[in-house]
Amino acid sequence: MMVTALQILFSLIRYVTETIRSVSVLFSDSEDEPDDEASSSDKDVSDATLPARTTYSIVIFLAGSVRRDKREMLSISQKGTLSPAMLPRPAYRGIEREDRGGVQSK
C-alpha cells in the first residue's frame, strides 16, 4: 500500500513538473516586448525566468491540481481498505449448528 502511495506521489510530481514546463513555454514568447536590437540581446535572459504575475497564477493552478489529486489518492486508499461492513461475517448460528441443548426428541 505504501509503495502505491509513493508511486502516485512521484507521478504527481512528474505531472506538476511537466505542467510547469509547458506553461513556461507558452508564456516565454511575450508579444508585449518590442522587437528592436536592444531587447533582442536581452531576450535570451528574459526567457529563462517568468514574470512574477505568471508564476503566481501557475502556483494557484498547481495548488488546485494537487488538492484534487490528494482527494483522489485518499479515495483510492480508502477503497483499498475493507470497512467492517465489508469483512466476512460468520453465518447466522441458529441455522448452521445443531441444537445442542434443550429438549431432545426420541
Curated annotation (Swiss-Prot):
Compartments (UniProt record): Mitochondrion
Chain spans, region Disordered: 27-47, 83-106
Any one GO cellular component localisation term in the record: mitochondrion
Sorted UniProt keywords: Mitochondrion
Origin superkingdom: Eukaryota
Biased composition (Basic and acidic residues): 94-106
Ranges of Acidic residues composition bias in the record: 29-39
Main location per the UniProt record: mitochondrion
The protein's name: Uncharacterized mitochondrial protein AtMg01130
Organism: Arabidopsis thaliana
